[in-house]
């Protein structure tokens, strides 16, 4: 997956969590080492996110502090994404299912290095009971309706998922301005 798309979808998930008042827990196995730091867009879009430092464990679920942070949310349904689909997303998702959690894995917000790796991982996580989704499905399911005060913020979320959607948003915004300002359309002018 191209890095800009991964970053944008991770940012969209973080913003969705913020709009829905959902807890966000982030972690990295060795952020100062070869795996690098977290994608900064995550905490930028979810300033309430809790970061849990790990001591090198590859599977986040093998870190007691991470598991405790998840349990402390009181939630039994998890939405999971990770930098590498077959590792960062799959390992903790499968482990959480084994402990009784309902887990939704956001595949297009998780990176991969090959189509084959993604297909193998999808088969593995589905067999384990993980439910695969994409970012747009997560957004739509949690948003539920456009008839809400924060609809413009949701529209911004969709521009992160579908960059071309920005054109529709701009068109809609302009149409709203025309109505609000009692302007005549060009087709209505004499």
Protein language model annotation of sequence segments:
Residues 20, 34-190:
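Active-site-adjacent betaalpha module
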Residues 29-33:
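Short active-site-proximal "capping" loops at secondary-structure junctions
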Residues 1-25:
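A short alpha/beta connector and helix-capping loop motif
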Residues 1, 26-28, 80, 107-108:
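Short linear motifs at secondary-structure transitions and domain/linker junctions
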